[in-house]
Amino acid sequence: MDLRRIMETVNMIDNENLDLRTTTMGISLLDCIDSDSDRACQKIYDKITTKAENLVKVARELETEYGIPIANKRITVTPISLIAAASGDSDYVKYAVTLDKAAKAVGVDLIGGFSALVHKGYQNGDRVLIKSIPQALKETERVCSSVNVGSTRSGINMDAVKEMGQIVIENEKINPLNNGNLVIFCNAVEDNPFMAGGFHGVGESDVALNVGVSGPGVVKTALEKVKGESMDVVAETIKQTAFKVTRMGQLVGQEASKRLGVDFGIVDLSLAPTPAQGDSVANILEEIGLESVGTHGTTAALAMLNDAVKKGGIMACSHVGGLSGAFIPESEDAGMIAAAEKGILTVDKLEAMTAVCSVGLDMIAVPGDTPAETISAMIADEAAIGMINNKTTAVRVIPVPGKEVGDSIEFGGLFGYAPIMPVHKESSAAMINRGGRIPAPVHSFKN
């Protein structure tokens, strides 16, 4: 590799906020199932603290050796609804507390997998887990929860959609920030390294390391050099930049998995913003030529960005997976925050944008008096986009008590802050209360 390319990468790290967003170890807990929940929890704690004992140490060694910042070290586990169902317990909070203790013991930032997969229907463990979510998130600091309510092959479980709206409101009453650790999915993936939606799928190996890259600032800087050029040039520039960013993820992921003695899973090609200036997906879209994100043309610009990132990234690594697209969280992106404050970026526009990117209505703060049925309807809309387009979509929405449009909420850290966004006042309750299942689309019949 020539010196110029090496210096380009050094400059990306020093001046353009390039980092690896996460190294995430996925751990199967299927061999921890036990009819005695205390024994099961002890097995879970022992396995996590053994397998992930050196995860943080190795990540820090690689940061020092390669000079590449690794923002987060995380763990995902098998969905707990599958593990805890054998116990017959009436709630699964103790499993969440065990995950939290294990995460703290090994020093990771977050642990995901307090999850249930109910896209076609409930099993007993799913019902118990979902009812346990509010208390589990109340009693833990690092645990993340997710529920998959639909898929292209199965349709949408509207009973689960209704219940998740109610769970979001229950979380709001305890602590609205807890909803930042809860994601409701359609077409959830098994190898997602990002939080709060990560879990370790049953088709994965016993232990695997997945990597999530970042780098919106790098893409924006590259586009500043092609002002006024055609969209062909813009797309090519994004592809070349994504290649460099992903190559770094592949290098670190392979080396980390080798040192940890685990399988190397995937690199997730998602562009993940932070609230820091110069680390914004919205600013990339504005660099392409929009006066503000949220105006007409936003969806087209985002579609091209997302596709070009995938095309560049696929060439750079052996296994691509996870969510692999541009994230558009309202609270974690300085450009999104600015556009929302001005009223240019709306929930409706964000919904349109999710049709062409990862992942969905993410970290959206809404008025505290928003009804549970309205939250459920937002979930249903997102799930429908995912189901019809055969892609992953999700909702992470945060109703804030006592707040209304014009106010804002401070989350702190990577979550940033969010202006309260208006939602439609017209009720969707009669539709949500029907329950049942929305059938899978006709083009899902592939066999």
From Swiss-Prot:
SUPFAM superfamilies named in the record:
PFL-like glycyl radical enzymes
InterPro entries given for it?
Answer: UPF0210 (IPR007841)
- Entry's CDD domains? RNR_PFL_like_DUF711
Q: What is an example of a Pfam family matching this protein?
A: DUF711
Superkingdom in the source lineage:
Bacteria
| Assembly behavior | Homodimer.
Q: Can you tell me which family this protein belongs to?
A: Belongs to the UPF0210 family.
Q: Which HAMAP family does the record associate with it?
A: UPF0210 (MF_01221)
Its recorded name reads UPF0210 protein Ldb1026
In its UniProt entry, the species of origin is given as Lactobacillus delbrueckii subsp. bulgaricus (strain ATCC 11842 / DSM 20081 / BCRC 10696 / JCM 1002 / NBRC 13953 / NCIMB 11778 / NCTC 12712 / WDCM 00102 / Lb 14)
